[in-house]
Amino acid sequence: MAAERSSITLGGKGSSLSSSSVYNVASGVANVRIDSSAIERFSTRNVPSIKRSSFGIPQGLTNEETRASLAVLLNKLILSTSGPPSSSTARSVLPLKIVEILNLKAESLELGEIDVTEGENIVLEKSCASLIGICSIIDHKSTTLSQIVDSVAALSCEVTKADIASFSLLDSGDGNGDKDVIGVAGDLKVLLNGYKGTGKLEIEEISKIPWIHGKFRYVVKSVHADARRELNSGVKGGKTGSGNTGIGEALGTTLLPLLTAIKNLGVCSFLRAKLCFEKIVDENLKKCLSEKICVENENLKNSYKLAYTAHLEEDYCRFAHKLNECLGIVWRIVGLEAVAAFFALAGGELFVQKSGDADKEESKTDKKKKKNEKKAVVGKGTSLVIQFIKDRLVSNDAASDGDQMHSLMQCGEQILNLFNPEGRSFDSLLDKVKEIVESNENRRLPKLPKGTRDFAKEQMAVREKAFSIIQNVFKRHGATALDTPVFELRETLMGKYGEDSKLVYDIADQGGELCSLRYDLTVPFARYVAMNGITSFKRYQIAKVYRRDNPSKGRYREFYQCDFDIAGLFEPMGPDFEIVKILTELLDELEIGDYEVKLNHRKLLDGMLEICGVPPEKFRTICSSIDKLDKQSFEQVKKEMVEEKGLSSEIADRIGNFVKEKGAPLELLSKLRQEGSEFLDNQSSREALDELSIMFEALKRSKCSERIVFDLSLARGLDYYTGVIFEAVCIGAEVGSIGAGGRYDNLIGMFGTKQVPAVGMSLGIERVFNIMEELNEKQKQVIRPTETQVLVSIMVDNKLAEAAELVSQLWGAKINAEYLVSKRKEKHFNRAKESGIPWMVMVGEKELSGSFVTLKKLEKGSEEKEDQTCTRDRFVEELKKLL
């Protein structure tokens, strides 16, 4: 009994036509009907008509393509009635005739002559129905192929046992990777979950799968978008002859990359299939399948040439027809790859055994061979695909014939039919593959968002050590702690960071207010000072901030900042000196290696730019360019200043001469203040040099000036800096700046009525963590994840009460202690060794009966020979002495 055909309704309110619907009508699995509301919109006027010999559908199309053309034409006629009624509005006669033709289950379509009005003739002439119809078929088949082909490629990976480690390297985490290539690699890893071939053999045909398939996915999406638009666009035209001109060129432009992508996909599948053939034991089967796929490969080459020629000749309908032909060939090649992979993975032999040869006696060697072949499929996803194929073949009794070769060929034909988009079981296969990928996606281990990290065990120990040092330094300078909300009103943050404002994270669910995650700790501090009317405040804050950029090495989207700020009126340059001094103390005590603090003055920069002839309105944007000199050459920065920011080449060169200057603070300051210096003639730069003179003298007397480098190329891109600016970098470590800051006298005034001058610094603690971890690894220092001093070891099972009594006494004495109850002695020593615990309180059967404990000291995790015994009432006091 034939399956009941579904029905697709056109012209309903809010309805749209999809490529899948066109394909279903074209392939005869769905009828088409016109919504009653659409029929009412057709014209009922008696208007002159003309005879046409056809619907304007080119000769040489397949029956499927012709039906698709008629389906598109029908929709275009319906769409032409969407405007106000006129003499050009289509009548119902022609659409109903098309519906009648489409719903007939005829092998060939007899279109015949038709009578059309002027308006209907415009639709027939200008709708490009055939091109759009074929494009819809291509869209549907390409989309389904992109969903199936990865599962077939995964089977080939299983056969070849190729190394797929490169699949995990495609997503670099910097946001610059190809989304579709990464997506294919991800789906392959899901299908190959549990795969054991990694690290064995790198095969080019396997390694390039993500790129070939990813680019195919990308182009298919583009075709889908264009097909959807053209399917649901009406035909606009009248007596002037205007219409949807350029549709052919537009679709031809979209389809041409797909032709190349399809050809590459087919060639890649063909090469993988050849690798699979080598693993097939039956020589006759191997030869037969190899001949078939070689024929298809030659057909693909020829069809590709014909399609490309049609495109060059601007015959876009013939081009689409030939492209559709190429697509059909690639479908067959992919199907043959699936057949080859199935037989290579023992699916064919197992099927024959079940169907007809189960009664034959097998040798031990054959049984062992089959057992190993069963183990060949180790990927969870690929195992399910193989099992799905087996179930379909067995249920269809494909190998009932006694002739093994004939049975195998029948089996192969059924697999081909399974991978045929027009086959009855194809939808089941497609659903199964989607189910595998989606269900495995749910079970896939979660991963961290880009630019974030977890801290655990040793990392937390390093972090706590760093935070302790930092807090001690901050408190030493008389600061009080402050904590502010992790998010602020968006208006508070916007306009404070210059070009970096685009990196602020906005919160999706605003809860009635426009809020953003804090970008730094300085702006929230300024908001707090202004909001509370504070005129003098020295504070520190250690908290997380968030930046929506592509993180480089040592940089994150979520990271800690350790800030120290001084707000209020003090001795001139006193706070500036102290802030820089604090930064040097921090870096010295953290012991992260050699470093230098680059220092400059924003007024000196402004004076320099004024001297060079830069317009005042461009000062900030040019400073942002100068700030890139630590990462780019001057030629690159000059190109940006000239081509993007509108400076003349001469002005850029003058800036280049100045920003080369850097050196010891007092020496370079003396040079810049020499008689005849251009800086002395500029008020802004002269003020800066006077302030720097005071500060450099203070730094020299505090014995930290050797760490300071006076650098005119330091610009710091943030808008709110007004005076001294500085940045600390590690010498010899490519991790960028590890601390920075400067004076910002106007920022607090932006939030209140009082102008409160302020200066501050921020330590990039994430980079400090990385450096500390690397140094620990190089020096092979063992970092204890815990501070446990004593392990209470109850070496008898089911004695929790004993452990509770003893360990509670230690906790009561403020001794860091853990307990373990197990009769396995090695378990206790392993625990102590892994955690670096120096002392054990051991209680075994002997200790229980004698009411005493044994104290054992561990040196680097190994047992000391001399143990001490102690009564239960005195062991805590004894441990206090020993610790």
From Swiss-Prot:
Where it sits in the cell: the answer is: Cytoplasm, Cytosol
The terms describing its cellular component in GO are: cytosol
Record field: transmembrane? none
EC id: 6.1.1.21
Reaction equation(s) it catalyzes:
tRNA(His) + L-histidine + ATP = L-histidyl-tRNA(His) + AMP + diphosphate + H(+)
Pfam families for this protein:
HGTP_anticodon, tRNA-synt_His
Q: Which UniProt keywords apply?
A: Aminoacyl-tRNA synthetase, ATP-binding, Cytoplasm, Ligase, Nucleotide-binding, Protein biosynthesis
Question: Which GO BP terms apply?
Answer: histidyl-tRNA aminoacylation
InterPro entries, alphabetically? Answer: aa-tRNA-synth_II (IPR006195), aa-tRNA-synth_II/BPL/LPL (IPR045864), Anticodon-bd (IPR004154), Anticodon-bd_dom_sf (IPR036621), His-tRNA-ligase (IPR015807), HisRS-like_core (IPR041715), HisRS_anticodon (IPR033656)
- Primary location group: cytoplasm
One GO MF term, please? ATP binding
The Swiss-Prot or TrEMBL record describes its family as follows: Belongs to the class-II aminoacyl-tRNA synthetase family.
Family annotation (PANTHER family)? HISTIDINE--TRNA LIGASE (PTHR11476:SF7), HISTIDYL-TRNA SYNTHETASE (PTHR11476)
Under what name is this protein listed? Answer: Histidine--tRNA ligase, cytoplasmic
Organism this protein belongs to: Arabidopsis thaliana (Mouse-ear cress)
